[in-house]
């Protein structure tokens, strides 16, 4: 994971998948609740990329462009928001749940999600900027709903 640059969205995904109580994704034959890995990563990603944007502005802008965002005329400082907005657009277009609320979480789960995710130090420490426990909780709160 370190070589791939995985960081906050992956670290946060362990909590999202691990604390799931009642989400049953369409198309999955399962007798128990689960949040598939890709969904558990993407539901946090827009909030994370807004948070990490200042740490590596050029990379965020390049990623937004690579995902099809309109970047003409954008400043380098716009990369994180363009990337987040593009991800949200793609989530809507492909039927991905609307943030954490879309997979069964609410504000009452923020503490548990934060505790579980903040323990994933190898991924949290790989982020392009430091993140405190309070900032992690804010990221989960920002991930509750996007539209």
Residue ranges and their predicted role:
Residues 60, 64-147:
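C-terminal charged capping/lid subdomain of soluble metabolic enzymes
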Residues 1-86:
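Active-site segments that bind and position negatively charged phosphate/pyrophosphate groups
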């Amino acid at each position: 994971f370190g070589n791939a640059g995985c960081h906050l969205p992956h670290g946060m995904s362990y909590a999202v998948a691990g604390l799931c109580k009642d989400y049953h994704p369409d198309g999955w034959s399962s007798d128990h609740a689960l949040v598939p890995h890709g969904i558990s990563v993407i539901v946090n990603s827009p909030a994370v990329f807004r948070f990490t944007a200042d740490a590596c502005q050029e990379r965020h802008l390049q990623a937004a462009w690579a995902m099809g965002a309109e970047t003409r005329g954008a400043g380098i400082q716009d990369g994180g928001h363009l990337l987040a907005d593009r991800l949200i657009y793609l989530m809507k277009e492909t039927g991905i749940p609307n943030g954490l609320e879309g997979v069964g979480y609410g504000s009452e789960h923020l503490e548990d999600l934060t505790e579980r995710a903040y323990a994933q130090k190898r991924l949290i420490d790989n982020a392009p900027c430091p993140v405190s426990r309070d900032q992690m909780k804010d990221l989960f709160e920002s991930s509750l709903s996007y539209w």
